[in-house]
A protein has these predicted regions:
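Glycine-rich phosphate-binding loops of nucleotide-dependent enzymes
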Residues: 1-178
Length: 178
């Protein structure tokens, strides 16, 4: 029997930033996936705002305000900034029986949210693959916050980034925490 996590206790308060460090195979990814609702703990409990919580799926974690940004970012390089920002949660317009994607509103929201973090998206229809690694990371974080994340779990948010891009991402993380 493999014990991936043992005696893990974490307490986070609003605005806090916590960094989890450990060797390869130490259980960091398992903890992240447990907090994200991918894995269920065999024992122990997850307590959020004083309530014991069980996640049956990643959607349950999202519904509780836990937004996870994985190392691969879950972005589609050939899709636009706007499409990647909304990813299945697009704003809709029209009558209830014939709703369509409100691209104008979506473009406006995506550009505004990216602008709030200092990234000028002149054309929200541009492919995400044309953005720098730091800009893509900030897009993924901004998306999680926009859709209600109270707690952001970031899996290696600066890996494979240059010094300037890593600095941009870390500044945004600090800004998001405040």
């Amino acid at each position: 029997k493999v014990i991936a996590l043992k005696d893990v206790t974490m307490k986070l308060k609003k605005g806090e930033i916590m960094c989890l460090l450990g060797d390869n195979g130490a259980g960091k990814s398992t903890l992240i996936k447990t907090l994200a609702g991918v894995h269920k703990p065999d024992e122990g409990e997850i307590v959020i705002e004083g309530e014991k919580t069980v996640f049956d799926s990643p959607k349950d974690a999202l519904d509780m305000g836990i937004g996870t940004v994985y190392q691969d970012l879950a972005l589609v390089p050939l899709m636009s900034v706007t499409r990647n920002f909304f990813m299945g949660r697009e704003p809709l317009k029209g009558p209830p029986f014939l709703k369509t994607f409100d691209i104008e509103k979506a473009n406006q929201i995506a550009a505004e949210r990216m602008g709030q973090i200092g990234i000028d998206v002149r054309d929200p229809s541009q492919a995400v693959g044309t953005m720098s690694g730091g800009e893509r990371q900030c897009l993924a974080i901004s998306r999680a916050i926009y859709f209600g994340a109270k707690v952001l779990v970031l899996d290696e948010p600066t890996s494979a980034l240059g010094v300037h891009q890593a600095s941009m991402v870390l500044k945004y993380i600090v800004k998001a925490a405040s």
